Amino acid sequence: MGKIIGIDLGTTNSCVAILEGDKPRVIENSEGGRTTPSIVAYTDDETLVGQSAKRQAVTNPTNTLFAIKRLIGRRFEDDVVQKDIKMVPYTIAKADNGDAWVDVKGKKMAPPQISAEVLKKMKKTAEDFLGEKVTEAVITVPAYFNDAQRQATKDAGRIAGLEVKRIINEPTAAALAYGMDKKGGDRKVAVYDLGGGTFDISIIEIADVDGEMQFEVLATNGDTFLGGEDFDLRLIDYLAQEFKKDSGIDLKGDPLAMQRLKEAAEKAKIELSSSQQTDVNLPYITADASGPKHLNVKVTRAKLESLVEELVERSLEPCRIALKDSGCSSSEIDEVILVGGQTRMPLVQSKVADFFGKEARKDVNPDEAVAIGAAIQGAVLSGDVKDVLLLDVTPLSLSIETMGGVSTPIIEKNTTIPTKKSQVFSTAEDNQTAVTIHVLQGERKQAQMNKSLGRFDLTGLPPAPRGVPQVEVTFDIDANGIMHVSAKDKATGKEQSIVIKASSGLSEDEIDKMVQDAEAHAAEDKKFEELAASRNQADALVHATQKTLKDAGDKVTAEEKVAIEAAIKELEEAIKGDDKEAIESRMQKLSEASSSMAQKMYAEQAAQQGGDAGAQAEDAAGKPADDAVDAEFEEVKDGDKK
């Protein structure tokens, strides 16, 4: 059996590692680099990947694709995609299925196809080093990637000719890399992962359980559209504005100039991590009637920090939520690990140190830790490494839509995976022969506010009154965080299932706000829940009253029947509205209108039972029943209660 390689498929750079004996090793690419730019370029006669693609970007900006990971598993209409369209020199196009694809030389291509080119380069790098064919890999994804984005990453692996043995979360992989060579007691670590395009925070407990290293993720959170690329954009905007002030020329319409500006901004940002000031000098950036123009701007570290401070602050809110979800306070965190190239920025390091109240460790390579962790996980799967147990979690709650547009969770966020949970539901209408299972991901109580992952129908239910059929819905999440959903009619054994292969990702607003919105809108959600409960209660009352009215037949007077039917009509109208009080008052009215009918029905029932039981009652008069219990009651004063 060949080696299972570990690949960190990054937004900006990618990295590949293996386990040599019991030591992880990052493999250098053909250019000698330990990381490879995640850039793919299409020229007239070839496809370039990595450093060679990056080198020619200035002369070929519209066919050089970078930061494709930010599009993977996303819809074209997503806000973040629309924002990205304005920022990149290449063309983002709408696919037939509504996904965000790219258009290269008139040909539409899916993000997994582009990512597959980077994965092929990683695969070839490993094969050249090992001298043998590589067919299996563990690939990492941001912890906050949703189901669609994980699926798309798996697809990219398959396109690259790799069997993806496991998709694991980047912070978890980094914790594996950190924890494997650290002997010591149990500890809690916070992995702060700010990469090129995504941000994750995971709180992980590392414990020694009977000689086995156990890595348990307690909570995770993040933002899939926050990373180094955003820091670059702030600096690019600033440089373009400064140039416009000096020359009156707006560079934003010139892809060639913007590509040069992008490279210069990235270089300046890196330089400012170790120096206080740098010059951005771009001769012949453009020209007008008066001749060529040169860009020369001094940028200080303080200026860069003022441009990006809001982005760093934005990363702290997910940290707060992750701490809260894990049940830990910042003082209980033993170690802070920084992952991702953007964490080299002094401002990021100081803000994280202030937040957690301790300095982050400096012995973890932020560019390589994730790939090393993936390689360790690969060795665990192949059996080369034993005594390691990894317990990861699902980042967002998974639910189905139930009556009244309510999102009913089956699996809560931060549940350890793999996991399988079932819940029994029933029908909302009489003689309903089919149910639609609508699968959702997110934290809101209202179904429409969550991310729709897919839907399917379970048909062929035998006609029965509402509430009678028993439909068991099962959610099964595998170790890759990918979900299988099935629905089974318990009476007939009929079953329908779906592997959630949603083709879109969550937009920035959706993913960034899902958990935060759920908290901010707690009152709104509570109100909605109460309204939905009242509607369902009213619906049940209408159904029960109509059934009793039908059973009562001629025992109800014409006036009573008219009054009851009028009250039903009023209640049905109220159910359509959004006024909980109106629904409840109409329910009261219907209960009052139908009370005399109910009394007659009970009286008739009692009379029938009374006739049958009369003789027995006479025999039993004055005698206590055999099974009656004599009991003494003692009043307990409040002061005597223990």
Curated annotation (Swiss-Prot):
Which portions of the sequence form the region Disordered? 578-642
What Pfam family is a match, any one? HSP70
Keywords, comma-separated and alphabetical:
ATP-binding, Chaperone, Nucleotide-binding, Phosphoprotein, Stress response
Compositionally biased tracts (Basic and acidic residues): 578-589
Tell what triggers its expression: By stress conditions e.g. heat shock.
**PROSITE patterns (UniProt xref):** HSP70_1, HSP70_2, HSP70_3
Phosphothreonine: modified positions = T198
One term of GO molecular function: ATP-dependent protein folding chaperone
Q: Where is the composition biased (Low complexity)?
A: 603-619
Annotated family: Belongs to the heat shock protein 70 family.
Classification via NCBIfam families: PRK00290.1, PRK05183.1, prok_dnaK
Report the protein's function: Acts as a chaperone.
Name of protein: Chaperone protein DnaK
Q: Which organism is it from?
A: Hahella chejuensis (strain KCTC 2396)
